[in-house]
Amino acid sequence: MTTNNQNAVTVTVTGAGGQIGYSLLFRIAKGEVFGDRVVNLRLLETEQGVQAARGVALELADCAFPLLGEVSITTELSEGFKDANAVFLVGAKPRQKGEERADLLAANGKIFGPQGKAIAEYAADDVRVIVVGNPANTNAAIVAAHAEGLDPRRVTALTRLDHNRGLAQVADKLGVAVRDLKNMTVWGNHSASQFPDVAELTLNGEKVADKLDAAWVNDEFIPRVAKRGAEIIEVRGRSSAASAASAALDHMRDWVNGTAEGDWVSVALPSDGSYGIPEGLVFSFPCRSVDGEWEIVQGLEISPAQQERIDANIKELQEEKAAVEEAGLL
């Protein structure tokens, strides 16, 4: 189906032929993020990934989604980001065995820098960008730094997966439904240092921190959420794909349509100095989406124990930033 519907939304997905892209695209085309708006999809791939993207495009056509408009495949950034209203930056170089994190940061910087420049030049003025490819926080910082003229708050990184993992772990521990839990927070970096925080988490409006044993929170919950990706690789033999895609959809849907009443979610975005986080550092905060814009939740009390974990994330992200600066990518 091809349409010139004036209310259509253009969505770009990089790494569209990969596992996460495959899990993402059909749900976007079905209307899970943008409601009843027609969706035009731009599948942006490397030369090596084009064939897989073609296969995805064939399957998208075979689904006969009523809301699916045009589907295009390209390797050119100018074509891939043209008039994009929403961008999912999924494609990234995976870490190889024996590779140092600094090497990974430098390699991905060479991918995300040009993408940031092209987004600023070719995407729609209202573009919303979510970086899924790891290391997501620092990749997002690189995108924002190269997207000259674009409001840095239009560029975010995915920590909703960690947020969702935290909700699932607490729901399982308490024997309750995930839907009854609100105000989970993930602070910091999408890495093993992240701080999933239950201090403000509520069950049917009542805080649950007192119902959770401190030893379980510190020794089991926090490490398990932080290392869940490695656990899934160990069990499944592949990295998280469907859950990562689902979290990215949650993130974009809430950004566009607003967060649920009385709840907040976790979003990594350039800091405005809130909670003492250095300005500009891409850091995960508790956020609400209001009128299509992310707002950091203010006024939460931070204990010394919480601050220690937050500080560890600041340190790690500053070290990542220094590594890409040294490589001339920031």
UniProtKB/Swiss-Prot annotation:
It catalyses: (S)-malate + NAD(+) = oxaloacetate + NADH + H(+). Substrate binds at residues 95, 101, 134, 165. Belongs to the LDH/MDH superfamily. MDH type 2 family. It is an enzyme of class 1 (oxidoreductase). This is Malate dehydrogenase. Its EC number is 1.1.1.37. One of its GO terms (molecular function) is L-malate dehydrogenase (NAD+) activity. SUPFAM superfamilies: LDH C-terminal domain-like, NAD(P)-binding Rossmann-fold domains. It comes from the Bacteria. InterPro entries: L-lactate/malate_DH (IPR001557), Lactate/malate_DH_C (IPR022383), Lactate/malate_DH_N (IPR001236), Lactate_DH/Glyco_Ohase_4_C (IPR015955), Malate_DH_type2 (IPR010945), NAD(P)-bd_dom_sf (IPR036291). Keywords: NAD, Oxidoreductase, Tricarboxylic acid cycle. The keyword rRNA processing does not apply. The active site is at 190 (proton acceptor). Catalyzes the reversible oxidation of malate to oxaloacetate. GO terms for biological process: malate metabolic process; tricarboxylic acid cycle. NAD(+) binds at residues 15-21, 108, 115, 132-134. Transmembrane segments: none annotated. It comes from Corynebacterium jeikeium (strain K411).
